[in-house]
Regions:
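Loop-helix junctions at membrane interfaces
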Residues: 11, 15-223
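Ala/Thr-enriched low-complexity intrinsically disordered regions
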Residues: 2, 7-9
Length: 223
């Protein structure tokens, strides 16, 4: 029997302040009530990210699917800071390791790309906390994530796939959709834009729901 870690508990543990200073902020600077909401918020977002990772929308390339598991991490980066976003990405992928079919390669790639996305967006938003800054940071983060996805897929993910599906067969899936004569070109034409669009969708949804969720995430009552 496979034992799966509890997403909320793991998120709670990683986001919990340790020692005299927490991972994300100093205890001296934040009141206890805020720290409580930080811990609970991280746990809830990590659990949501884990659940969303299992809700996939298939794409024309049958081994690539669209999911929205980066959305909770993006919300966490905006609410609690960029490091929180990375921690939520970490928890999500640690949980998914229990049912991994990619030899942990997929989770590693997902963590790298998701961390680049949320870290970039969170850092930009941290400098100027406006809706425009959040959207700009998210789009820039999605763009960088898309760029990083090229070497990640080419050198990490796809070499693992070749153990189960010949390189020629993988290329054939792409060739059924458009003219391409190499895996390198296929990843550039399909995977990179796909990754960017995936990030932009998360940014668009976050722009719509972050403000209504902000009182809960920040532990503040609506006025």
């Amino acid at each position: 029997m496979t034992v799966r870690p509890n997403a909320f508990a793991l998120g709670f543990s990683l986001c919990r302040p340790h020692g005299r200073k927490g991972i994300i902020m100093s205890e001296k600077k934040k009141p206890t009530s805020y720290k409580t909401h930080l811990i609970v918020g991280c746990g809830v977002l990590a659990a949501a990210a884990t659940a969303l990772q299992y809700l996939e929308i298939p794409s024309p390339v049958n081994f690539i699917a669209l999911d929205f598991s980066d959305l909770p991490a993006l919300l966490g980066a905006f609410a609690y800071g960029p490091i929180a976003g990375v921690l939520i990405e970490l928890v999500k992928n640690l949980i998914h390791l229990a049912v991994s079919k990619s030899g942990y390669v997929g989770e590693l790639s997902n963590f790298i790309l998701g961390s680049v996305f949320t870290l970039t967006a969170g850092l930009i938003y941290k400098k100027k906390k406006t809706k425009k800054s959040a959207i700009l940071g998210g789009i820039i983060g999605a763009l960088i994530m898309a760029v990083v996805s090229y070497p990640s897929n080419l050198f990490v993910v796809y070499p693992f796939y070749y153990n189960f599906m010949p390189k020629e067969a993988v290329l054939g899936v792409y060739q059924a959709l458009f003219k391409v004569n190499s895996i390198e070109m296929a990843i550039l034409i399909y995977n990179v834009p796909f990754t960017f669009i995936k990030g932009v969708i998360s940014v668009a949804v976050s722009a719509l729901i972050y403000k209504p969720l902000k009182p809960f995430l920040k532990g503040k009552s609506k006025k």
